[in-house]
Structures are given as C-alpha cells and as structure tokens.
C-alpha cells in the first residue's frame, strides 16, 4: 500500500487525478477549521513560556525528531530549560503521560521514546497538545516548550513555527491529501517563522540542515560485541522515507547485503527481524532501535545521527526565543 501511495504522491501516478475531488473536500474542511480559529469561534490557548512548534506540511517523516533534539541541545547550551510535548503517535495510552527512559515505544510513541532516551528532556505526551503543555508546566520547571509535530493543532498557542521539509522529496506533487502528501498548501510556508530543508538546497529565507552520522551503537544496551565495519550488514528502516537511510549507509561506506523498508511507526516482531538478519549484523535507525531494545540481539546496531544547522539559524532562533520570553515575563509582571 505504501509503495502505491509513494507513486501517487511523488512519482506522478495517474491515480492522483481520481483522488483530486477528495483533496478539494479536504481543502474545504481545513479552511473552515482555520477560519473558526481566526474568527475566534474556536479558541487558541496561550501559554506563559515561549512555545516552538516543530512540524511539517507533508505526511510522513521529514526530519522533525532530529530537529527537536537539536533545539533541545541548543537551548540548553544557552541556559534555557526546555521541555517537549508530543501526540505520542501510536501509543497505547489515555489522557497525558510523562515520558521516562524506562517507557517503551509502544506505551509513549516512537519519537518520544527516542527523544527522551537521547536527551533525558522533560516530556509529556497526549492527544490534546494544550493538556500536555499544561501538564508539562505543572510538573517541571521548564521555560521553553517545544511541540514535536502539531503545526496543524491550532488550539495550542504558539510563538514560533518551524517547518521541516524533506530536501530529497520536497512537497511531492504539491496536492493536498489524499491526492498528494500535503496537510496544508505550500502557501503555509510563507506564514511560518523558519523553514528548514533537510538534506537539500535551501531557497531564500530557508535554512539547510544536514543529518550527520555520529556513531554506530548496539541496540541492546547490555551488548558487549564490537561492530566490524568491514562486514556486510542487513539494513532496515521503519521511517517515512527508508531509502534516505539506506543511501546514508552507502555514503558512509557500509556494504549492504540487503535493505528492507518497513512502514513508519510499525511494531516489530523479534522472529521476523531475526529471520531478516539471518547471521549478518542488522543495522537500523535510532528510531527503530527504541522499539527493538527489549529483544535486540548482540549483532543488532543503529546509526545515530546529529542535525547540523548554520550559526545564522542558531542566532535567529535564539534571538526570537529571548524576545518572546522577555515579552511574556513583562506581561506576567504587569509591565
């Protein structure tokens, strides 16, 4: 199914024309929804600290999670104490939940499990972003909130909007769902504060981001094996665009005996992965690793990557955060 969807959205498959009437309906529904917020018929909840929403206007992975991790580290380096909220897509939960390093991806979602495992940041997940933000502020002394995804969740007040675009696939055929991958039209890029292009050339007023491989690490934290870079690996990825990961491995000099893409957010079965790997090392993404760590074998590995952005981006982002923080502190003191 995903193969057909990708052909429709990114390869010009003619079936897209049959889906266009549904895209028109989707456009109408989303336009009405935005109008309700703009006219004040639906309310947006402001928060007492700066809120950065990291999202995209397309369906599927674009590099939001590495961007969130980058922002966490950048803000911490400048003395801020950020916290993160997320939907926790696919999580088996009700209400809101504080994410801990002991939580499984099944209980809190793939991305939250990965973010907390990497950074230890205060994080709360839940279906309603406003409720998760309030819970985060109630339980942790955070002074900046980063919302992982949620660009279209207009009930959450936000001060900075950052959109991540896949530099390889772009906006696909530029049609709205379901004929294309767009959640909102390309016009939305002109309204956000920052547009970050992951792995591709940035246009004027956009910022280029590269994902730089940093280390090969064991999926099983108790494993004592040492990775042999001369040995061919079986590569797997359950992300929005698996081919990007396989291309990265090849560029880094890995020999791929086999590559296999899974659906994004897919749960994994130990037996299936053992059969896939056979006797060879299994190489996966960091997001996949958090779903496999409880049953990982000695020769299962993941490639950690770090987002790299320009000093100009850092300067502009931090300047905006400080400005918003000062304004909100002034309001709280009646200035």
Curated annotation (Swiss-Prot):
GO terms for molecular function: ATP binding; tetraacyldisaccharide 4'-kinase activity. ATP binds at residues 58-65. It catalyses: a lipid A disaccharide + ATP = a lipid IVA + ADP + H(+). Its EC number is 2.7.1.130. Pathway: Glycolipid biosynthesis; lipid IV(A) biosynthesis; lipid IV(A) from (3R)-3-hydroxytetradecanoyl-[acyl-carrier-protein] and UDP-N-acetyl-alpha-D-glucosamine: step 6/6. GO terms for cellular component: plasma membrane. Keywords: ATP-binding, Kinase, Lipid A biosynthesis, Lipid biosynthesis, Lipid metabolism, Nucleotide-binding, Transferase. Transmembrane segments: none annotated. GO terms for biological process: lipid A biosynthetic process; lipopolysaccharide core region biosynthetic process. Coiled coil: none annotated. Transfers the gamma-phosphate of ATP to the 4'-position of a tetraacyldisaccharide 1-phosphate intermediate (termed DS-1-P) to form tetraacyldisaccharide 1,4'-bis-phosphate (lipid IVA). Belongs to the LpxK family. This is Tetraacyldisaccharide 4'-kinase. It comes from Shewanella sp. (strain MR-4).
């Amino acid at each position: 199914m995903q193969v057909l969807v990708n052909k429709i959205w990114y390869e010009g498959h003619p079936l897209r024309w049959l889906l266009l009437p549904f895209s028109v309906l989707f456009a109408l529904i989303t336009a009405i929804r935005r109008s309700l917020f703009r006219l004040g018929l639906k309310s947006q909840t402001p928060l007492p600290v700066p809120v950065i929403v990291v999202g995209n206007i397309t369906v599927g992975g674009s590099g939001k999670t590495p961007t969130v991790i980058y922002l966490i580290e950048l803000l911490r380096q400048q003395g801020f104490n950020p916290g993160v909220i997320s939907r926790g897509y696919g999580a088996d939960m009700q209400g809101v939940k504080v994410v801990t390093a002991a939580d499984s991806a099944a209980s809190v979602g793939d991305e939250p499990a990965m973010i907390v495992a990497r950074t230890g940041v205060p994080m709360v997940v839940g279906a309603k972003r406003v409720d998760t933000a309030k819970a985060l502020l109630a339980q942790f002394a955070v002074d900046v909130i980063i919302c992982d995804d949620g660009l279209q969740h207009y009930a959450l007040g936000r001060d900075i909007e950052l959109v991540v675009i896949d530099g390889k696939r772009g906006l696909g055929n530029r049609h709205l769902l379901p004929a294309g991958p767009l959640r909102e039209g390309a016009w939305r890029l002109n309204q956000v504060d920052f547009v970050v292009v992951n792995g591709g050339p940035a246009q004027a007023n956009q910022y280029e981001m590269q994902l730089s491989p940093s280390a090969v690490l064991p999926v099983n934290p108790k494993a004592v094996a040492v990775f042999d870079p001369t040995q061919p690996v079986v590569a797997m990825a359950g992300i929005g665009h698996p081919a990007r990961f396989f291309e990265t491995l090849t560029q880094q000099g890995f020999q791929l005996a086999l590559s296999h893409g899974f659906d994004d957010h897919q749960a994994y079965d130990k037996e299936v992965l053992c059969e896939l790997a056979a006797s060879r090392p299994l190489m996966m993404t960091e997001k996949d690793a958090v779903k496999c760590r409880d049953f990982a074998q000695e020769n299962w590995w993941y490639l950690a990557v770090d987002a790299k952005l320009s000093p100009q981006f850092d300067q502009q982002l931090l300047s905006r955060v400080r400005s918003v923080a000062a304004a909100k502190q002034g309001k709280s003191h009646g200035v």
